[in-house]
Amino acid sequence: MNEKIIKSENDELSVSFQNVKSVCVCYSIYPLLQFLLLMDENMIKKHTCYFFGSEIPYNIRCKLPCFCYETRPAKTFFDKIKRIVTKIKLRITKDSLYPFLKDADFYAQDFGYLSILLGNRPYSMLQEAPNHLNFVGQEDSVEFQRLKRKSKSLKGRIESFLYGSIAAGYDGNNSQCKALYLTEETNAVVTQNKIIHVDSLKSLWEKSSESKRKFILSVFDLTDDDTEFLAKYPILFLSQPWVNDCYIKEDDYVSLLKEVFEYYDPKEIIIKCHPRDTFEYEKYFPDIHVFSKPINMQLLMLVAFNTKKAVTFSSSAVDCLPENIEIDWFGTPTHKLQKQTDDMAFIFNRAYNKINWKI
């Protein structure tokens, strides 16, 4: 009987089912970067199977031995029903499809579709974004209270029955989560009775070997040309995937952008797209340069990229920037959008300029 092999699509890496020792579950590239920095090079290349949501860009996931599932929000009624069926099917078949899940160590973003893979097994939680638990893990936060209500609701109980207990108790807020890997300190209530590991991305990067650093840069396709191109512009606009995530309509998003860009010289500003953001900025703002490679700001900072000013609606990425970089923070103009994006929950650890909306 032939041994089953998981290959990267670029054919450079492979791991047999028998050799899988760890499983990495990610929807976004911040926890993927964190995982690659936490593990040794041998583990990340030869003994890990990656399960990615479709939000992970193809040019990244094709370089790692992985399985990818369509996890973007279902828009039509038919798509929503189809998604429910495929999730139930995955819960029933996961152990026969992927027998290595029974013995592997799990490192995961623990919400949504792919949390089904965890079943009732213990796992370690990777951090979704900078300061994530400071936003969602506080008892008075919007997200914490929403999850609390969901866990007691009929919908939450049905989802827990269909998909597993984590469906209504993610972000580490369950008994299966044994450890939290964080990039900063937090006093979030979900940290109680768990093993806490705190290592900044910078400290993990500095501890990494030169060969591992090169491998990580190759995975994310970050080159010297990229950093030199970005450094030409003194003002960096950090976008957010609001249209992709169905938080806002395209026309409304363009209106917000127009007001923001009125404050700056188009020759001095560059749009640095969020890794999930596929919005066509060139179509509406042909005079402004765009950097659309799916690379997170934190990785750019690790390779000594710098700028004079960062501008954003409410991107948490600005909190990783050094004090010498000025920040213009616009926030969100409507209460509905604030609730959707958790803008109101953002906790700043540094000085910034709050820009008021005219609309």
Model features per residue range: what roles?
Residues F215-D224, I235-C273, D277:
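Conserved catalytic-core segment of nucleotide-activated headgroup transferases in glycan assembly
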Residues C68-T71, H289-I295, F346-I359:
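Short acidic-hydrophobic, aromatic-tinged amphipathic segments that line or gate anion-handling sites
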Residues S8-M43, P234-S239, V254-F261:
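N-terminal beta-strand-loop-alpha-helix module at the start
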Residues D319-I359:
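Catalytic binding pocket for nucleotide-activated donors in carbohydrate/polymer assembly enzymes
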Residues V15-Y27, C49-F51, K102-Q109, E228-N244, ...:
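Short hydrophobic beta-strand segments
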Residues D140-Y233:
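A nucleotide-sugar donor-handling region in carbohydrate enzymes
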Residues V23-Y170, A317-D319:
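Active-site and donor-binding regions of nucleotide-sugar-utilizing enzymes
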Residues R276-E323:
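Donor nucleotide-activated moiety binding/catalytic core segment of transferases
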